[in-house]
Structures are given as structure tokens and as C-alpha cells.
């Protein structure tokens, strides 16, 4: 059994989703958005850090999964997104959580089956996979999709990591 916190970072709205994985079964534990209404970026980053820290304290996840930065046409937006990611990652690292990153295309491919899926398709599949009564908010759905992706891909990541570790020690299995 493992609890996974997924984060969809944003400088104004950061989505979060928490699920429990027991074998192949996924259980919804909670989701929502950290909304920053203040105008200056440092204050928004502080709110993101505090919000993610509070969520970690509340749910006690074992794993932290976050969306990777993508290349944006607007450099200023990309920088702000990177800073929001940094605030969330520092909150996780401060509580000794391992951090995993997934590209948006990889998340959509894993959850919907199409790397170019629309937000509404992600929301629908998250609702279906977690047996929710309604579609979650878009940012929360993205965060839940990131957590689901971690569940599906983490076994491969672990196996690859162990294989590299064993090879580095000169042992083969």
C-alpha cells in the first residue's frame, strides 16, 4: 500500500490529488486547488509552499509526483511555472519525500491512451478510474492523473533503478 501526492503546478492555481494504491487498486483520498490571489510572485510561491506542506502533513504520502516543465511560447510564464514547481518540490523534499517527474504528454498517454488528449478527456478518465461521482476540477484532475501515472509507471522505474544499482555493484540477477 502506498499513498501518492500528485501536483499540477501553476503560479496562480496549483492542483493537488492524493490517491492510495493497494496492489492494482486505486482509491481516491482527496483533491483540490491551492489558489493564490496575491499579486506579487514571492507571496504566491510562499502560499504554494505552505499549501503543499499542509497537504503533505494531512495525508502523509510516501511519494510525490509532479508535472515536468514544458516549453512555452512565453518565457515569463515558463519561468513562473518553474518557480511554482520549485516551491512545491522544496515542500516535498523538506519532508523527505522522493520526487518523481512526469511529462504532460506521458500523463495523458498513461491515463487516456492518447498523448494529445484534451483536458475534458483527462477529467473523464480520472473520474472513471477513481470511481468518482463527478468530474474533478481541471487542475485537480491533472494532479490526480499525475498520481495515477506514478502508480502505473513506478514499478518500471523501480525495476530500472534496481537493475542499475545491481549492475553498479557488479552483480547480475
From Swiss-Prot:
Cofactor: binding comment: Binds 2 Mg(2+) ion per subunit.
Keywords annotated in UniProt: Cytoplasm, DNA damage, DNA recombination, DNA repair, DNA-binding, Endonuclease, Hydrolase, Magnesium, Metal-binding, Nuclease
Residues binding Mg(2+) 2: 67
SUPFAM superfamilies in alphabetical order: Ribonuclease H-like
Cofactor (UniProt): Mg(2+)
Pfam families tied to this protein: RuvC
Top-level taxon of origin: Bacteria
Protein's UniProt keywords contain DNA-binding: yes
Cellular location(s): Cytoplasm
Binding site for Mg(2+) 1: 8, 139
Gene Ontology annotations for the cellular component aspect, listed alphabetically: cytoplasm; Holliday junction resolvase complex
Enzyme Commission number(s) of this protein: 3.1.21.10
Reactions performed catalytically: Endonucleolytic cleavage at a junction such as a reciprocal single-stranded crossover between two homologous DNA duplexes (Holliday junction)
An individual GO BP term: DNA recombination
Catalytic site positions: 8, 67, 139
Subunit field text: Homodimer which binds Holliday junction (HJ) DNA. The HJ becomes 2-fold symmetrical on binding to RuvC with unstacked arms; it has a different conformation from HJ DNA in complex with RuvA. In the full resolvosome a probable DNA-RuvA(4)-RuvB(12)-RuvC(2) complex forms which resolves the HJ.
Record function comment: The RuvA-RuvB-RuvC complex processes Holliday junction (HJ) DNA during genetic recombination and DNA repair. Endonuclease that resolves HJ intermediates. Cleaves cruciform DNA by making single-stranded nicks across the HJ at symmetrical positions within the homologous arms, yielding a 5'-phosphate and a 3'-hydroxyl group; requires a central core of homology in the junction. The consensus cleavage sequence is 5'-(A/T)TT(C/G)-3'. Cleavage occurs on the 3'-side of the TT dinucleotide at the point of strand exchange.
NCBIfam families: PRK00039.2-1, ruvC
Family to which this protein belongs: Belongs to the RuvC family.
Protein name as it appears in the record: Crossover junction endodeoxyribonuclease RuvC
Gene for this chain: ruvC
Amino acid at each position: 500500500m502506498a499513498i501518492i501526492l500528485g501536483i499540477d503546478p501553476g503560479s496562480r492555481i496549483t492542483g493537488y490529488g492524493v490517491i492510495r494504491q493497494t496492489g492494482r487498486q486505486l482509491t481516491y483520498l482527496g483533491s483540490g486547488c491551492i489558489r493564490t490571489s496575491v499579486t506579487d510572485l514571492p507571496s504566491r510561491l510562499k502560499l504554494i509552499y505552505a499549501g503543499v506542506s499542509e497537504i503533505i502533513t494531512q495525508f502523509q504520502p510516501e511519494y510525490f509526483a509532479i508535472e515536468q516543465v514544458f516549453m512555452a511560447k512565453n518565457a515569463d510564464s515558463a519561468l513562473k511555472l518553474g518557480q511554482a514547481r520549485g516551491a512545491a518540490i522544496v515542500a516535498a523534499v523538506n519532508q523527505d519525500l522522493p520526487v518523481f517527474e512526469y511529462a504532460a504528454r506521458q500523463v495523458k498517454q498513461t491515463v487516456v491512451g492518447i498523448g494529445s488528449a484534451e483536458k475534458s478527456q483527462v477529467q473523464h478518465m480520472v473520474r472513471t478510474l477513481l470511481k468518482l461521482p463527478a468530474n474533478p476540477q481541471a487542475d485537480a484532475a491533472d494532479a490526480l492523473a499525475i498520481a495515477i501515472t506514478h502508480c502505473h509507471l513506478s514499478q518500471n522505474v523501480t525495476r530500472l533503478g534496481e537493475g542499475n544499482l545491481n549492475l553498479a555493484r557488479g552483480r547480475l540477477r
